[in-house]
């Protein structure tokens, strides 16, 4: 089966693959961030959002993977084989978990639309030849201030502006203010 864990969130494995592997913080840092920001929601029996559910599943999956790795590490006698397993998990599975954790934490922190806009912006930036692109990559935390996110679907109904009143050409008279009305 070809399952893309980002599909229902409007992203894809391919879109996240534009971000270099060293972009993503360590699993430990991401777990600490998730715990600090969303512990109550993650531990709650209530359904909060699809991103909370996906984040919860990624945390549980990583825990199970570490349990399995500990078992393998304790039962493999050959140090070279043990090293191969550890490297494989850290390189392949670790990257996938780091991507998942980063994506869902970022969606909860900045909003899904902003994260998707960031992924597209970064993808365009990284594929543009260096001579034709700005020197610095887009930064997620600054996107909400610098980009306009357009929602898909129907555009909001535009209101026509109300007609302006015609102003007289004569200078406006100032009313004299009483001392009591000045603040």
Swiss-Prot record:
Region Disordered, annotated ranges: 136-183
Residue span of region RNA binding: 177-183
One Gene Ontology term, aspect cellular component: T=4 icosahedral viral capsid
Modified residues (Phosphoserine): 155, 162, 170
This protein's UniProt keywords: Capsid protein, Cytoplasmic inwards viral transport, DNA-binding, Host cytoplasm, Host-virus interaction, Microtubular inwards viral transport, Phosphoprotein, Repeat, RNA-binding, T=4 icosahedral capsid protein, Viral penetration into host nucleus, Virion, Virus entry into host cell
Biased composition (Basic residues): 149-176
Region named 3 X 8 AA repeats of S-P-R-R-R-[PR]-S-Q: 155-177
Subcellular location, record wording: Virion; Host cytoplasm
PTM comment text: Phosphorylated by host SRPK1, SRPK2, and maybe protein kinase C or GAPDH. Phosphorylation is critical for pregenomic RNA packaging. Protein kinase C phosphorylation is stimulated by HBx protein and may play a role in transport of the viral genome to the nucleus at the late step during the viral replication cycle.
The UniProt record lists the keyword Transport: no
Start and stop residues of the Sequence repeats: 155-161, 162-169, 170-177
GO biological process: microtubule-dependent intracellular transport of viral material towards nucleus; symbiont entry into host cell; viral penetration into host nucleus
Top-level lineage group: Viruses
SUPFAM superfamilies assigned: Hepatitis B viral capsid (hbcag) (SSF47852)
Motif (Bipartite nuclear localization signal): 158-175
InterPro entries in UniProt: Hepatitis_core, Viral_capsid_core_dom_sf_HBV
MF GO annotations: DNA binding; RNA binding; structural molecule activity
Record has Magnesium as a keyword: no
Pfam family, any one: Hepatitis_core
Role according to the record: Self assembles to form an icosahedral capsid. Most capsids appear to be large particles with an icosahedral symmetry of T=4 and consist of 240 copies of capsid protein, though a fraction forms smaller T=3 particles consisting of 180 capsid proteins. Entering capsids are transported along microtubules to the nucleus. Phosphorylation of the capsid is thought to induce exposure of nuclear localization signal in the C-terminal portion of the capsid protein that allows binding to the nuclear pore complex via the importin (karyopherin-) alpha and beta.
Subunit structure of this chain's protein: Homodimerizes, then multimerizes. Interacts with cytosol exposed regions of viral L glycoprotein present in the reticulum-to-Golgi compartment. Interacts with human FLNB. Phosphorylated form interacts with host importin alpha; this interaction depends on the exposure of the NLS, which itself depends upon genome maturation and/or phosphorylation of the capsid protein. Interacts with host NUP153.
Family label: Belongs to the orthohepadnavirus core antigen family.
Protein's name according to its UniProt entry: Capsid protein
Organism: Gibbon hepatitis B virus subtype ayw3q (isolate Hope)
Recorded name of the encoding gene: C
